[in-house]
Amino acid sequence: MNHLPEKMRPYRDLLEKSAKEYVKLNVRKGKTGRYDSKIAGDPYFPKHETYPTDENGQPMKLLAQINFSHIPQLDGYPSSGILQFYISVHDDVYGLNFDDRCEQKNFRVIYFENIVENDDELVSDFSFIGTGECDFPILSEAAVEPVKSSEWVLPTDFQFEQYTGMETMEFFGQFGEDEEDIYNELAENGFGHKIGGYASFTQHDPREYAYKEHTIMLLQIDSDDDIDSMWGDVGIANFFITPEDLRKKDFSNVLYNWDCS
């Protein structure tokens, strides 16, 4: 559970109502198997499926892969199947459309519900992606170790107001000269790589103004020297989905965002 700053302790009961489970992804550089959960590397991909391409017809690269059979179960998320996140390697903003963050032209989210277990039926050579001179935020393939945990709502997440009953800046303003320190101390809890839980941002939550139904975080990938991950100037990336779309296992309207300081 989150570390709670001393002056925030009177609000513990409010924050406890926001508790949400998530899966923390501990990462390490290294080769991964095609069925493994991973960051970067080569995907599980059946030969009979159409490989994702960007708006210019160029193959996209795997950003992350989640094998739900290999991670602790989260309420509402699939219990099996493989979920993949791809982004264009020929786009200097890593596939993000600032005007429509759900438009999957230069990023793609793919879910394989039924897994092909015959290796002969899977793509094994991904040299066609051509990443020699590419724009991609992660330089090293990484294996993940999933650990289930829980956290309270973060001040960076637009849902913070729902639990405190006050606008975020108004809430922290009551701490006077300690406002910034307390905000930063609480926000620090939310960084890192994870599935589920609440989102961290270096700028602001785009769901504060639109996409308010995208309340569930599918994935967060942070800047991380250990795996040569760098989103702009030490930024962070998130993918969100609506509860209804997640229930239907429909990943066509996923919200993608990344920002940096």
From Swiss-Prot:
InterPro entries: DUF1963, YwqG-like_sf. It holds the Pfam family DUF1963. This is Uncharacterized protein YwqG.
